[in-house]
Amino acid sequence: MHVTAKPSSFQCNLKCDYCFYLEKESQFTHEKWMDDSTLKEFIKQYIAASGNQVYFTWQGGEPTLAGLDFFRKVIHYQQRYAGQKRIFNALQTNGILLNNEWCAFLKEHEFLVGISIDGPQELHDRYRRSNSGNGTFAKVIAAIERLKSYQVEFNTLTVINNVNVHYPLEVYHFLKSIGSKHMQFIELLETGTPNIDFSGHSENTFRIIDFSVPPTAYGKFMSTIFMQWVKNDVGEIFIRQFESFVSRFLGNGHTSCIFQESCKDNLVVESNGDIYECDHFVYPQYKIGNINKSELKTMNSVQLTAQKKRIPAKCQQCAYKPICNGGCPKHRITKVNNETVSYFCEGYKILFSTMVPYMNAMVELAKNRVPLYHIMDVAKQMENN
């Protein structure tokens, strides 16, 4: 089980054009800050429901708005309830509030920090803006430099939209240049209707927002970056999507929930203790309990698991079904013969067709006990052939 905690709910100090939390303000009427009793109950139950290694993820909105004193209490309660278990903390942030005091705290308590950044300035500032409409690039870069000066481990999260999707190498080389060793690319899709479950909808009952990334462009973007990575950066740069497929091909299963067979065990706890089945499905019908009233260990993603397992006939017949599993239920909005398939289907096929030969080559390397970074030599040979 993994639970993402949202101590400040949907609240944020930025107003990014594409943020799906902008619609949440009218939905939530509960207290927007996690109080002490809810925090304590969550930490106690989550540690009890976890194995010997417990991974906490703090997200938003913008979690740093909860304040440093809140996170000092996080450490206090974790230490109280950890017993012999080892605790890990990850913080996903826009970086705006990361001053010296924050960075010293994050270093002292060994937080892994995820920084949201969408590429070089002209690409990042296209959608990631302040409440006053100004670009945020300079402040984010300053935060990254401050993290580096305090030797805080960080990674990057990049939202692929209709603009930066056309600049894969510029984005990739930029992220490398700022010192990102671990990268995650999120494909952006938002509709005019809150994206819940389109399986029962008729065609054309929704519109795709302009900033969403076109499927084939996304596939080409990721394929271009994959080829750069597989020829030059394996073992040095870690890209979440690619690492997930390496894990899958080596027989260990996907590490990315999008392509897993089930949606179970990726829950969200809201600031008032409400538990939802997924970060992308924080809607009333997907609420499964409250940490202050129910036992966390008894909760699971029943509805999403059912949606995930409703694999359309088109997917069942696809050669990539074993490694794709129909993609994320959030993305299943494209009608095919009265069924809904992933909006990103054609893009995924472009990426899979690029990756699979190299993944198979990695499997052969592993069988022969050859370090996987040797795929870079193999990849160059394959390209020359």
Curated annotation (Swiss-Prot):
One of its GO terms (molecular function) is 4 iron, 4 sulfur cluster binding. Residues 1-231 form the Radical SAM core domain. Its cofactor is [4Fe-4S] cluster. It holds the Pfam family Fer4_12. S-adenosyl-L-methionine binds at Y18, G61, S116, R128, L189. InterPro entries: 4Fe4S-binding_SPASM_dom, Aldolase_TIM, Anaerob_Ser_sulfatase-maturase, rSAM, SPASM_anSME, Sulphatase_maturase_rSAM. [4Fe-4S] cluster 3 binds at C315, C318, C324, C345. [4Fe-4S] cluster 1 binds at C12, C16, C19. GO terms for biological process: DNA damage response; protein maturation. Binds 3 [4Fe-4S] clusters. The first cluster is coordinated with 3 cysteines and an exchangeable S-adenosyl-L-methionine. Signal peptide: none annotated. The active site is at D279. CDD domains: Radical_SAM, SPASM_anSME. PROSITE patterns: RADICAL_SAM (PS51918). [4Fe-4S] cluster 2 binds at C257, C263, C278, C328. Belongs to the radical SAM superfamily. Anaerobic sulfatase-maturating enzyme family. This is Anaerobic sulfatase-maturating enzyme homolog YdeM. It comes from Escherichia coli (strain K12). The gene is ydeM.
